């Protein structure tokens, strides 16, 4: 029995990155030997065991053979005669097909170290094409390591494009698509994930609402980058700098979906694109089974982001109604989230990346003023039932009006 550290732990250590999870491969052992050594079996489809002390995963070396459609249609063979090289051959990328023995020696059967040095994401073998999920995984790795200047090998991108054209991605379940997307949204450069999907044709298959934005122009005065698809990826990049939250990043990604519905004769203007985009957000989220809290924020951002941009001239009643519409009284975090998505929208434009977004500050300040109005005073004043809500709203509007008169004085006619 020989045990090797494999995959991501070896890769990240060689890159000088923190190692989070460790996975191990066991060569020359049977399930019975593992159980007798105190390991706990957790895998049904193939033998995976938990170490009795560290609880890290130890998998018996195995080979896989395509036996059906999609990413689950594989027949697994695990036995003592399976070699380490055979096990590594089934992995997706060469940089993930590295192993390390107990003396620290690196086993590199497929050029993974060279590709790490060259910052290249390259598939191990033609068997890559048997698993459509790998298209999304490679896009995610491209996003994860974009700050290290990694790129996808031409032959790997060509294979991903061929897999997409062959309809392989249609076998992916919504849950797996969302899981990969969610993981990609947590990376430092999530926009790269969607750019790679577009490069191989997968964006049109998995996110047609986003793909439809490319080639749609916006007024050059406000959008020097002109193309709405490019703007969308720029805003996502900016959102990633402003917030680590998947909710904020996904909402930013979806904020302009309505522009894809504008008839060409109205280009480059997109009147009413916010409310129009809400249904598209609902469509994506229903299709991919996106969690409700993420969906709800994305819908609100699509509907109200343009309103936030005009915040200095909004009437106090409109501001309080906005807080009602986003349910800020019960979910106060939404104020900050919407401030950040709106800022990402403004700064996600060519030449505007470093601009100040005063509307966000005003939104936050107005919220502090409105929420400081005590409900207790209204109740103690004798208001009952629906009257409480009405009076509370009046007092909030007045408080915001008093603040706004000092903070945002408007020129007199």
Curated annotation (Swiss-Prot):
Subunit structure: Monomer. Can also form homodimers and oligomers.
Upper lineage: Bacteria, Pseudomonadati, Pseudomonadota, Gammaproteobacteria, Enterobacterales
EC number(s) given by UniProt: 2.7.7.72, 3.1.3.-, 3.1.4.-
UniProt: ATP binding residues: 8, 11, 91, 137, 140
Organism superkingdom: Bacteria
Protein name (record): Multifunctional CCA protein
Keywords annotated in UniProt: ATP-binding, Hydrolase, Magnesium, Metal-binding, Multifunctional enzyme, Nickel, Nucleotide-binding, Nucleotidyltransferase, RNA repair, RNA-binding, Transferase, tRNA processing
Cofactor annotation: Mg(2+); Ni(2+)
UniProt record, GO biological process: RNA repair; tRNA 3'-terminal CCA addition
Recorded name of the encoding gene: cca
Textual note on the cofactor: Magnesium is required for nucleotidyltransferase activity. Nickel for phosphatase activity.
Binding site for CTP: 8, 11, 91, 137, 140
């Amino acid at each position: 029995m020989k045990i090797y550290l494999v995959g991501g732990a070896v890769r990240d250590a060689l890159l000088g990155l923190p190692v989070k999870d460790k996975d191990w491969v066991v060569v020359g052992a049977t399930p019975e030997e593992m159980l007798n050594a105190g390991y706990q079996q957790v895998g049904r489809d193939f033998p995976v065991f938990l170490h009795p002390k560290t609880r890290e995963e130890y998998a018996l070396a195995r080979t896989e053979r395509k036996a059906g459609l999609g990413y689950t249609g594989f027949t697994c063979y695990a036995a003592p005669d399976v070699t380490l090289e055979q096990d590594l051959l089934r992995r997706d990328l060469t940089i993930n097909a590295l192993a390390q023995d107990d003396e620290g020696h690196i086993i590199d059967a497929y050029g993974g170290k060279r590709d790490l040095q060259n910052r290249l994401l390259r598939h191990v073998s033609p068997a890559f094409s048997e698993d459509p999920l790998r298209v999304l995984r490679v896009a995610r790795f491209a996003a994860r390591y974009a700050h290290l200047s990694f790129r996808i090998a031409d032959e790997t991108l060509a294979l991903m494009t061929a897999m997409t054209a062959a309809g392989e991605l249609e076998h992916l379940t919504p849950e797996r698509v969302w899981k990969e997307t969610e993981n990609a949204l947590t990376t430092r450069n999530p926009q790269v994930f969607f750019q790679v999907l577009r490069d191989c044709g997968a964006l049109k298959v998995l996110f047609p609402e986003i793909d439809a934005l490319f080639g749609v122009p916006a007024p050059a005065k406000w959008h020097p980058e002109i193309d709405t698809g490019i703007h969308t990826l720029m805003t996502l990049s900016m959102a990633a700098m402003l917030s680590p939250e998947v909710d904020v990043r996904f909402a930013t990604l979806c904020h302009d979906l309505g522009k894809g519905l504008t008839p060409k004769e109205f280009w480059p203007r997109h009147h009413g694109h916010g409310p129009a985009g809400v249904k598209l957000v609902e469509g994506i989220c229903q299709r991919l089974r996106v969690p409700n809290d993420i969906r709800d924020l994305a819908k609100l951002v699509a509907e109200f982001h343009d309103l936030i941009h005009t915040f200095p001239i909004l009437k106090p009643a409109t501001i309080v109604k906005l807080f009602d519409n986003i349910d800020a009284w019960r979910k106060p975090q939404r104020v900050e989230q919407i401030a950040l998505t709106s800022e990402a929208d403004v700064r996600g434009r060519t030449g505007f990346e470093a601009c100040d977004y005063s509307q966000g500050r005003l939104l936050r300040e107005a919220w502090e003023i409105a929420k400081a109005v005590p409900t207790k005073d209204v109740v103690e004043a004798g208001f009952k039932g629906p009257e409480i809500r009405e009076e509370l709203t009046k007092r909030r509007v007045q408080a915001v009006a008093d603040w706004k008169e000092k903070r945002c004085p408007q020129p007199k006619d």
